[in-house]
């Protein structure tokens, strides 16, 4: 089965443009399914993936307390895989065409109030005053995530050339390799300049490459490290909810909307193909993004 999964992984990467995170999740889901099938019928092949078997696997997952969002993703993984396998001639028919995807409840993570966000950013700024390279980096992580609302994976994937400091713009590569331009404000610019001038040069090694953000050993920053930075920074604010980068992203979106930003503009800034249950997707110019961001974001 591993050779089949390798081929499927290549399909997800090259033809579907799925992220590394999504591909790892899908392959893990399929390995779970194959283990379930093998336990029931040792040595079974792809022909053993019938609709009743798929339903039994999902039922077992649900009974074990698997979250609805995870069940929805696993259903999607199976449906994508079986459709691909039929096209490749690996299966005679697609058993997942009638497999129902459990509806995932939409639950928004906790968000910061504007005063809590300000306190968190002030704390990060205070910690960076001594010029410690890691403190300068941590300040930039928190400041840029809140200023732009981008995903932590997008932030850690940025190269130096993706940043236009003079125009305060980021070129972000989002899900499905979709590129978008996101503005940021003056506080984020100050944090960025301090990092590029004093922080990054102190950590850079031959392995750094073009990466904007670096870990302590000079390699591209891992998103897990960035999550730790956000948790620790926000956790120091009295009364603030325990949030990570995703919560900071939702905080940025919430504060933009509170400031009067149009929902479709926020959708473009966040890189969503849909926002909530809507099907709207509106392309806006960089100038419009800049104007709305300056008017609506509390730290523009």
Swiss-Prot record:
Chief location of this protein within or outside the cell: cytoplasm
Domain of life, per lineage: Bacteria
Start and end residues of each Core-binding (CB) domain: 1-86
A Pfam family of this chain: Phage_integrase
SUPFAM superfamilies the UniProt entry points to: DNA breaking-rejoining enzymes (SSF56349)
GO MF, one annotated term: tyrosine-based site-specific recombinase activity
Localization annotation: Cytoplasm
Catalytic residues as annotated in Swiss-Prot or TrEMBL: 151, 175, 246, 249, 272, 281
The protein's name in its UniProt record: Tyrosine recombinase XerC
Family according to the record: Belongs to the 'phage' integrase family. XerC subfamily.
A biological-process GO annotation: chromosome segregation
Key words of the record: Cell cycle, Cell division, Chromosome partition, Cytoplasm, DNA integration, DNA recombination, DNA-binding
InterPro entries named in the record: CB, DNA_brk_join_enz, Integrase-like_cat_sf, Integrase_catalytic, Integrase_recombinase_N, Integrase_SAM-like_N, Tyrosine_recombinase_XerC/XerD, Tyrosine_recombinase_XerCD
Protein task: Site-specific tyrosine recombinase, which acts by catalyzing the cutting and rejoining of the recombining DNA molecules. The XerC-XerD complex is essential to convert dimers of the bacterial chromosome into monomers to permit their segregation at cell division. It also contributes to the segregational stability of plasmids.
A GO-annotated cellular component: cytoplasm
Subunit structure: Forms a cyclic heterotetrameric complex composed of two molecules of XerC and two molecules of XerD.
């Amino acid at each position: 089965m591993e050779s089949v999964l390798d081929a499927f992984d290549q399909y997800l990467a090259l033809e579907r443009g799925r992220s590394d995170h999504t591909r790892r999740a899908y392959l893990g889901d399929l390995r779970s399914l194959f283990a379930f099938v093998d336990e029931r019928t040792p040595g079974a092949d792809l022909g053993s993936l019938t609709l009743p078997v798929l339903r039994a696997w999902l039922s077992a997952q649900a009974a074990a307390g698997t979250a609805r969002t995870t069940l929805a993703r696993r259903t999607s993984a199976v449906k994508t895989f079986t459709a691909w396998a039929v096209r490749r001639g690996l299966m005679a028919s697609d058993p997942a065409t009638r497999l129902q995807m459990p509806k995932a409840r939409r639950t928004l993570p906790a968000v910061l109030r504007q005063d809590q966000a300000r306190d968190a950013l002030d704390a990060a700024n205070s910690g960076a005053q001594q010029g410690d390279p890691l403190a300068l980096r941590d300040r930039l992580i928190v400041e840029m995530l809140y200023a732009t609302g981008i995903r932590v994976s997008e932030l850690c994937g940025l190269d130096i050339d993706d940043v236009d400091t003079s125009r305060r713009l980021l070129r972000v590569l989002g899900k499905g390799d979709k590129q978008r331009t996101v503005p940021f404000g003056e506080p984020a610019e100050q944090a960025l300049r301090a990092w590029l001038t004093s922080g990054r040069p102190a950590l850079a090694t031959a392995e750094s490459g073009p990466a904007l953000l670096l870990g302590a050993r000079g390699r591209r920053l891992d998103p897990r490290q960035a999550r730790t930075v956000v948790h620790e920074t926000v956790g120091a604010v009295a009364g603030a909810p325990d949030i990570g980068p995703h919560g900071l992203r939702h905080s940025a979106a919430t504060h933009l909307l509170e400031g009067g930003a149009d929902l479709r503009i926020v959708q473009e800034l966040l890189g969503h193909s849909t926002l909530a249950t809507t099907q709207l997707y509106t392309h806006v110019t960089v100038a419009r993004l800049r104007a709305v961001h300056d008017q609506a974001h509390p730290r523009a």
